[in-house]
Design a protein with these regions (language model features):
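Signature of N-terminal electron-transfer/Fe-S-associated modules in redox systems
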Residues: 1-202
Length: 202
């Protein structure tokens, strides 16, 4: 049995809304006839997006029927991949990278900010039940360390002050601007020299 277990509190029913249903059908069309079960990961993601960032057992059963796939097979996929949340995380799910590059650049300060603003413990919902946070392994944006991910967006080049400001926005129901918080474009250098051509006048 997986160590990642579903929440004890589960809704009785789940079904795709019209937007999710349209997206699911579009994805299934990409697969050859008889291979629709290959869309299971994409459909789990759609279900998670619809259901405030987590997947209840009812959604797994629904997807199983939708794909003519045994429920246990859907359950195996959902519990194996950590990108699928098996319990409520709130409308804003904050993932703080604490792998070496981010830690060396001050990720511990981002963790402090999350503890102060959201909850003292990881994976614990904020007082308004709208937000939670957790430490994660590398999110692949090492050059913009330290950084964190909120739902689908990256927030990069952070410090504690900027992190607190971002968290204030989401706790008030807003959506902060993603990207670099030091004014960089993607992962360009921070100084005046942006390309090798700039070295001519160095």
């Amino acid at each position: 049995m997986s160590l990642r277990r579903p929440s004890k509190e589960q809704p009785k029913n789940f079904e795709f809304n019209s937007t999710s249903l349209e997206a699911a059908k579009a994805i299934i069309k990409k697969y050859p006839k008889g291979r629709q079960q290959s869309a299971v990961m994409a459909l789990l993601y759609i279900a998670q997006k619809q259901n405030s960032n987590w997947i209840p057992l009812a959604a797994m059963k629904y997807i199983g029927k939708f794909l003519d796939m045994p429920y246990i097979k859907v359950y195996e996929v959902a519990t194996f991949y950590t990108m699928y949340n098996l319990s409520p995380v709130g409308n804003f799910f904050v993932q703080v990278c604490t792998t070496t590059p981010c830690m060396l650049r001050g990720a511990n300060k981002l963790v402090e900010a999350c503890k102060e603003k959201i909850s003292e413990k990881e994976s614990e919902l904020s007082s308004d039940k709208n937000c939670s946070w957790m430490e994660v392994e590398c999110l692949g944006a090492c050059v913009n360390a330290p950084m964190m991910q909120i739902n689908d967006d990256y927030y990069e080049d952070l410090d504690k002050k900027k992190t607190l400001e971002i968290l204030d926005v989401i706790l008030q129901g807003g959506t902060p601007k993603p990207g670099s918080y030091r004014g960089r474009v993607n992962n360009e250098p921070e100084n005046i020299r942006k390309t090798l051509m700039d070295l001519k006048n160095a």
